[in-house]
Structures are given as C-alpha cells and as structure tokens.
Design a protein with these regions (language model features):
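A conserved regulatory-domain signal marking ACT and ACT-like small-molecule sensing domains
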Residues: 1-146
Length: 146
C-alpha cells in the first residue's frame, strides 16, 4: 500500500518550512508534493515521502494536523500527450479521482501520476484491467529505482 501525508496548513510565512524542518530532522525525503489553497487562508499540503508513517507521527507530534491516506500511483510516459493517453485509459477503466498530481521519474521516459480515489482495491483492479501499471510503494518512496 502506498500512502500520502496530508497536512492542513494556514497560509502564513514559514508554515511550509516548519513541515520540511520536521522531515529533515528525521531524514525523511520528500518524493513529491502538491500544495493547494482551500479557503480563508488555509491550504492542504499532500506529500509523498520516503517514510509516510513516521512523517505522519512526527508531524502530528509537532502540533500539525496531518492525515495518512492511501493513494494509487500509476506509471505514465513522460512525453507530450503522455498524460492525455493515461487519462483516456483511466476514463476507460471508469475510475474517478478527487485529487491528482504528477512527478517525473526519468525525464523523457517515465513519470508517476498520483491519484486519490474512493475505493482503492476496486479502482486498482479496474486500472490494471485496462493495462495500466500500478507502481509499488518501494518505487514511489524511492527505496527501489526503475
């Protein structure tokens, strides 16, 4: 299973750095991030890190509001139109996602597309059934390389 850590952050100077300081101290590497503004000066930071369980624990212990959520990471080709091809397959599979972001792994070769879906087991199966490759947590976290 692959997880992201989501942190509810106030949009204030230095708040993101507080997160990165906690992770740096624990030698947790950020593999991918997505920060978006919500409302009234708040945002949600989604992180894929080398040790999500420890990051979740340490961030909460530091007084932050962090959640651990399972995600699906799909391999895509890093080329013009690569995302479009992937999205066509995701639509063909009948999978809807509520949040998404990408990360280039090998420039011009591979990228990861991180998606947040409602029914992880069912949606994973649907994606595999249309020929998409689900990336293992060891590859996502950088424990192994492609």
């Amino acid at each position: 299973m692959t997880y992201q850590v989501s942190i509810f952050l106030e949009n204030k100077l230095g708040h993101l750095e507080k997160v990165t300081a906690v992770l740096k101290k624990a030698e947790i590497n950020i593999r991918s991030l997505h920060l978006n503004h919500t409302a009234n000066g708040w945002g949600i930071l989604n992180l894929v890190v080398s040790n999500p369980e420890l990051a979740h624990k340490l961030l909460n212990e530091s007084g932050m509001s962090a959640a651990l959520r399972e995600i699906v990471v799909v391999k895509m080709t890093d080329k013009p139109g690569g995302l479009d091809e992937l999205l066509k397959d995701i639509v063909k599979a009948g999978v809807n996602f509520t949040n998404a972001y990408g990360r280039v792994v090998n420039e011009g070769v591979n990228a990861f597309f991180v998606i947040d879906v409602q029914d992880i087991p069912d949606d994973r199966l649907k994606l595999v059934n249309v020929g998409l490759e689900i990336i293992s947590d060891h590859l996502v976290y950088g424990i192994q390389s492609l």
